[in-house]
């Protein structure tokens, strides 16, 4: 044998991580793909290129990115590019040095972090804090489909193709199909609820609670099944060893790690972030627990799941973990995980092996029907509307990216064939695209906010109390809200809602400080606010804190307003001024919240822009000059109705300024008639010297702006309507310069940063949802 030629023909079993670049071999630059790092970078680049291309098309139909990840995997799979197979032998011919190994490692890390984050962010109290209905649904939705499928799993076993699977493996495959279709994975449900923005709705809470109960059953059965499989297929001794290992993991998690976590929380000052070293230590512990679980023949997600249970949701640890690792997990690791898992699908296997998997398809349909029924029947029994019952059942039956990881783990263990795996993934892909659209048509959370009664100030009965919901985001909102409330009559009912961005949690929380005083932190500004609002004379006050997602805050406000039968909601604007009236900052999140609130609230809305003058004069008992700019329309009439409530306060001097277009003529329009009636009533009131009335004629947009700016110098607070309907004067030249459309044209002029004035503004919109 020629030793030299033999050595020259050898392929090394080890591989290098990084290359010398294209210059290493100019004749064959693809030599860089013989190194693990460039190969992995190229794989990731291809994955995200296809994801971006696909999603740029699908997003125009309102489809979330998840189906794009799956479709990218199918394109890169055996049907077209076959990226896995091409990459497999790039590093070495040794199977242990598979070229897909590094990418597979990233995929597993994504699965681990997702399981951990979802467990941390879901409140364990959620399962049993929403009554008996979710407990019944969660229990039945697992037991009934599982037992129903188990009863028919042995049918049609006579004609099993031995080249497909052995009879015993076919039965095991059917059990996997039955159990996977009976289970409900929380990340999938949370994804759909978040996409539809109904996490804090009644339907969302019901489905989340039921899913958590179902998950408990599914996890227990899964652990038991793996122990039984180890007992039968490996050895009883190994099964006993694995059982002891699981018990040790549980004991270490709850008896050792949980006290350590509590110690970290206790030594972290309130309102301060937890030290980075603890955050990184938690993540390393999660990865170590996954390795431990895998070593003892359990699913590697068991360890992260247990550690997620012992980590307290929210600040300081939960929020710190979210801030440092969630963006990386959800935007990088999860797309890679989903695409990599989907690349293993071979759609042609479904066609070629249909005769072997048709009964699995039947089992999926059968168990899905049973789960749908067990979700609907309890809902209908509890008088839940039919469409909402269907929506709840669809959510319980939904499959998406979380199930992909479950299917892949069973495929890795050879419990299911590639044909069955591909069909399950295809069903998850179809679910991800169709379920959100179907749910949007079945369930609209805004329906409950539609006002079948007039919930505004103008239609309030004379002997009725004025019910106000005032919202606060920051400490500086408190003094402005209290000052404004002091101008109103003493017979008002005030609900204060403190809005807090949800961090480190998934499910929103609403805390009533009147019922749960012990949950109010004594040294926090919200405790000060509670005391300050309580000292308002002859005012009935209720206080809540809503901890929720930024894009769901408007829904929480609407829900509280509906429960409290509120006539008007007062919210701060996104602009912040210093005490001396200088512009300081603008909060775009608050502006977006106000815009959403204007579209969905079931009562009137008031957006308060405080330049400092209102807080200063209101708290120091100075007299206040209030001006109302009246042009016409229902918003202006509502603003006038609110201001007329202030006339009983001797500190408040009210002036109504009507702006009249030089081209205005009498009209039979209903709004014009109502405006005329309101103004006639106001002129009668003027005779009592409680409200002054004046008129000014304007000829166009520039004169409107000049008039409004001059008026701002004469008053401490100006109240205006947001929209003026058909009564609007010629606003030519003004609409194009509006910076804050949520305030309307006049409100935007008064809240402008260029306006040299200390005047505060309240922009009023009358109830829209009627």
From Swiss-Prot:
User: Biological process GO terms, please?
Assistant: potassium ion transport; proton transmembrane transport
Localization in the cell: Membrane
What is the tissue localization of expression for this protein? Expressed in pollen.
Can you tell me where the transmembrane regions are? 37-57, 61-81, 103-120, 132-152, 175-195, 206-226, 244-264, 277-297, 327-344, 361-381, 423-443
Task: Enumerate the UniProt keywords alphabetically.
Answer: Antiport, Ion transport, Membrane, Potassium, Potassium transport, Transmembrane, Transmembrane helix, Transport
The answer to keyword Lyase applying to this record is: no
Q: Which GO terms describe its molecular function?
A: antiporter activity
Cellular compartments per GO CC: membrane
Instruction: Tell me how this protein sits in the membrane.
Output: Multi-pass membrane protein
The UniProt entry's sequence similarity note says: Belongs to the monovalent cation:proton antiporter 2 (CPA2) transporter (TC 2.A.37) family. CHX (TC 2.A.37.4) subfamily.
The protein's role, per its UniProt record: May operate as a cation/H(+) antiporter.
The protein depicted here goes by the name Cation/H(+) antiporter 12
Its taxonomic placement starts with: Eukaryota, Viridiplantae, Streptophyta, Embryophyta, Tracheophyta
